[in-house]
A protein has these predicted regions:
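Conserved active-site and SAM-binding loop architecture
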Residues: 1-249
Length: 249
């Protein structure tokens, strides 16, 4: 893999004639999850404005095939603008069709696609490790809510409701996100005890090999939050693999 630096400073003409372009630009200011924060959620005028650089790249390279990925925008106007710029209608795909994680994303592509498969039967317990270090378990009090529901318990901490949720291993995981502290990591009830999902579990939920993110940067191993955030910001591998399989048609 060759890195070509900052997207804002790149000379796209050098890549003219490449056959395939894959793009997934910053989604923070498009996300419905963060719509309550006007400081963050300002659509394509915010951090997600890097989308327009990706469009510049698409027009300069003129690849035979392309795929753009992004969250469901909080604004219909943003969705319309993105679709007009890319030039094809998006398809909404939930990665639960391919993995143990529900993750709805829009994909804009001119790759010929077949019929979407039925939802995968995989759930959280199917990819959980046999044994987990004690450091991943919470010492905080928790309350069992309803073992027949996906959110089966609640951690007793001073944080927003979403961050207190403990998930039932008999269901699929909800959408992974980046981690910024404050109990943002996803939680599961494991043998009657609440714990945070491990880095390996985050990787498996995205369809990646174990310890895919166990790497060093500037001589230091990536932290738990950095590794999980990479997964939260990344693509679901089996979903993208299915889309790219259309190139064989």
């Amino acid at each position: 893999m060759v890195h070509h630096g900052d997207l804002y400073e790149a000379d796209f003409e050098q890549f003219k004639g490449f056959d395939l372009l894959l793009a997934g630009t910053c989604c923070q200011s498009l996300s419905r999850v963060r719509i309550e924060s006007k400081k963050v959620n300002n659509g394509l005028d915010g951090k997600s404005g890097i989308f327009f650089k990706a469009i510049e790249c698409l027009r300069a390279i003129q690849p035979q095939y392309f795929m753009f990925e992004n969250v469901i925008p909080s604004s219909d106007e943003d969705l319309k603008t993105m679709t007009e710029c890319i030039g094809v209608e998006p398809i909404l795909i939930d990665s639960g069709r391919f993995s143990s994680q529900n993750r709805e994303r829009y994909y804009w592509t001119n790759i010929p696609l077949g019929k979407l498969p039925d939802e995968s039967p995989l759930v959280l317990k199917d990819i959980m490790e046999n044994s987990v270090d004690e450091k991943y378990f919470y010492k905080k009090d928790f309350e069992i809510l309803d073992m027949s529901k996906r959110v089966c318990a609640e951690l007793k901490v001073n944080s927003m409701e979403m961050n207190r949720r403990i998930y039932n291993p008999d269901f699929k995981c909800c959408t992974l996100t980046c981690i910024n502290g404050g109990y943002h990591e996803k939680k599961v009830l494991d043998s009657g005890r609440p714990r945070k999902l491990t880095e390996v579990k985050y990787e498996r939920l995205q369809g990646l090999p174990d310890n895919f993110t166990k790497i060093q940067l500037n001589g230091r191993w990536l932290s738990y939050s950095k590794r999980c955030s990479l997964m939260g910001n990344g693509w679901n591998e089996p979903t993208v693999e299915w889309i790219l399989s259309g190139l064989n048609n």
